[in-house]
Structure formats: C-alpha cells, structure tokens
Amino acid sequence: MRNNNVLGLLFSNMHDEGLRELTGIRALGSVPFGGRYRLIDFPLSNMVNAGISKVGVITKSNYQSLMDHIGSGKSWDLSRKNEGLYFLPPFGNTDELYNGRIASLSGIMPFLRNSKEEYVVLSDCHIVGNIDYDRLVEEHIASGADVTIAYKKGAPPADMENVLLWTASDGRVTDMVIRSGGPEESRYGIGLYVMGKEELMRAVDTAVSRHHGSFEWDILLRHVEDKRLYGYCVNEYVSVISSLERYFRANMALLDAEVRNELFVGSRPIYTKVRDCAPALYGLHASVSNSLVADGGDIQGTVRNSIVFRDVKVDRGAVVENCILMQGTLVCADSALNCVITDKNVVIKDDRTLHGFDSYPVFINKGSVV
C-alpha cells in the first residue's frame, strides 16, 4: 500500500546522552555512520520507501549539521510543493522544553492538528535498519491497535532503558517492563511506534495535563490493560546505537557481507545527501583489506578492517586497523591506529601510536591535532 494517509515523525535528539562523545556538537540523527551516511538516513529512508510523503523532524539542540545534511529533503524526494519535509525546532527557550518525547510532541501540537493524515509513525534516530514500514502500518491497521510497538527478539542493550514486552498469540501486549538490559531472549522495543493521530493527540494532552513526561511509562506502561497495545516483531537486521561501543560495533558489522546485504536492499534503498567527489586514490605502496573506503580519499599507507569516510588521507607508512576515520581525517606517516574513532578534520601527526579495544575504542574530538 502507499501510505499517503500516514505522517512520519522523527525524534532527532532522543538518546543524545548515550553517545555524548559524538552528540556534543550535533544531534544524534546527524551522527556519521558507515562511511557516507548519517543515522537519520535509515528511518527517513524507511518512511520514504513506504510511501510516506509528509515527515516532521523534531529537533531540540545542535541541529545545524542535521539541517545542512537534510536540506530541503531533495535526496529523499521530499522537496515538494505540497507536504514533504518539515523541521520542527523548539518554540520556546526554557530548559524544561523537549526533555522527553511527550514534551516534544506537546510542542508540535499545532503541526499535528493541521495534518490531515490519519496515522502517525514515530521513530527515534538510533535505529540502524532497513525496516518495511509498509508492513508495519498494515499490521497496525489490521489489528485495530491503539498503539503498535515494534520490537526485536534477543538480548536488549544493557546500557539503556528498554521496553520489554510479553505478548499473546495474536500479538496483543499482555505485560510490559521498563528496565536497563534484560534476559538474553527478550522482546525489546526499538523506539518505533504506530498510532492513530487522534489517539496520539489525546494521549499527549492527557499526559501533559497530569504532568507526566515519559511516553513509555505514562502512555504505554500505564495503559497495558485498558488500551489495545500490540507488538510487531521486526525480522530485518537492526542495530540499536545506545553507546560509543555499540556505535563502533555497528560500524564494524558493515564489513560483514551478510549484514550489508540485509541493510542495503535494492528494493528499499537507503538515501543520503549526495556529494560529488573523485574516487579514492590508492598509492603504489597502499595496502587495503576488508575495509569500506569512501570517495575523495587518498590512501598511501595500510588500512585493514576499517570504515573510512570521505576525504580521508592516510600517508605512506601509516597503519590503520579496526578504525572509524570520519571526513577530513589526516593520518600522517608512520603512525599506527587500532580501535580508534576520529571525528571530522582530525590530524594524527607523524609517528603516533593510538591503541584502544573494541569494547573501549579511543575517541578523538572534531578538529583535534594529536
């Protein structure tokens, strides 16, 4: 089905605190990923691939890079005369605003009231996955649910608060717990929901009138028994970015061909802002293996098991292993990096050695010189 009757809402700053190293200067949605993407590209592309033609991006702070990346939405075919892409920034300047999902939704209530769509898909930007939103919306409508909660089966992230679900044979949620971590075989929410627009507006208005602030605690958990809450099992590959370690592991997972094939599906492409650069240059002494190297790079040294973004230069004699080098990074001669994440425009000078671990990668701030 084509979802012209569905509104998409993206929360670009939700979970910023889990990735503080990278979100100090940008929203979580604009965190670089996989050599050429930003985290918001995945849920935004999922919406577009499902035919959702009106998407609101809810922002809180540090959203300049997000606006630069998305622009008018042209790369996602959302630069339209009618509907298309909407940025929804804070409307006030008090510290109490937008400190949770309910406050964010309360702040965009005029936008919701003026939208003609009947259903709303709400998604956080910490989900890396190519999910069929078409099927998700169809299941929501067919079940007659008040809220559909997308979940994965497996071990939930131990470093964030998870919504753990128990469901009946028909998918209806019979019990719910909110806690950090959880058993190895859990049904845990991934921050993706479908609701009727009117139901969402009523729930938010009620929560605000009672000074409730948590969507999960006050709209979901409080109403397990008196609302029709249904679970939807996401079978596609999904990685939840909740910490620097999980960010590192999610990037490294792209070096696995099976993961790439699940994430980048030809019938449901992941769109991003196009930057026209020359292909990467590989010198006579370059050695590159099991790595993703974006265009515009200049590789003269050794790169193994790494994610290399655009315009990265690795000088002769330098060795880069198990690293994520973001745009504009320069690794000078005879330096050795292992399990290192460099933010944009970092310079690693000659003969430097930096060594982290996959469970604790070394992070270098944007523009730093080491």
Ranges and model annotations:
Residues 1-253, 364:
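Unchanged
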Residues 1-12, 198, 206-370:
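Left-handed beta-helix
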